[in-house]
Amino acid sequence: MFGTNWKAQAGHGGFYQAVADGSYKKIGLDVDIQQGGPQMNNRPLLAVGKIDFLMAGNLLLSFDNVKNGVPTMVVAAIFQKDPQAMFANPGQGDDKFSELAKAPTAFMSKDGQFSFWQWMKAEHGFKDEQLKPYVFNVGPFTADKKSVQQGYSISEPVSMKAQGFDPVVHLLADNGFSTYSTTIETRAEMVRARPELVQKFVDASLIGWYNYLYGDNKAANEMIKKANPEATDANIVYPPPRKLNCKRWVTTPGN
């Protein structure tokens, strides 16, 4: 069982591709994908053996596991550059990332607060007094023109633009947040006891990602839409998956 950290979307496409085109089966693996979401946190399920592999957003929560003695390991990373971003309302003078630290309100999820928010405080002067919970609804952000909000640069802007709203997008990676993203994590015991299985899963996942970016990804996209009815053709193909190319986002052999 492979668990993701959020609802099915194009940013998870390579894993769905590996199921859809048989990349996992060809290497002897029978893989089911359990999507995450507001009501499904897959991270604690990994440590207790309810899932075998986890897709994580960035390395900070993985570091936190190490700090707290949770026996998990990162075995691969798909994205070299994290698509995590902060959004600002247009026309508010927030064209520079440094200006966001002055916003009275920052809508942030719990996971965000425990991971990249800590970096934002340490490196850019954000303060906990700014925090309000992000409930994965952009309404409060668009209504409060002085607020800022976390988001995924290849996800939320699509729904916002469909509503006629074009946010100012600041990639954390362009402002010093250096971490791999869309990582594959498993239990340390799995790496020790079944290294060949771990290697097979990583290899087949990378094949799935290559095929998703450069091959026929229609079947994978249909799986995504079936798993997550909020996923539409419009937000799956924007930005087009092939724009998430190896030079910018995805690790390549030898890198």
Q: What is the predicted role of each segment?
A:
Residues 26, 99, 172-177, 192, ...:
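Short, solvent-exposed loop/beta-turn-alpha elements that line the ligand-binding surface or hinge
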Residues 84-94, 181-196:
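A bilobed periplasmic-binding-protein/Venus flytrap-type ligand-binding module shared by bacterial periplasmic
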Residues 153, 157-174, 179:
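Extracytoplasmic/periplasmic substrate-binding proteins
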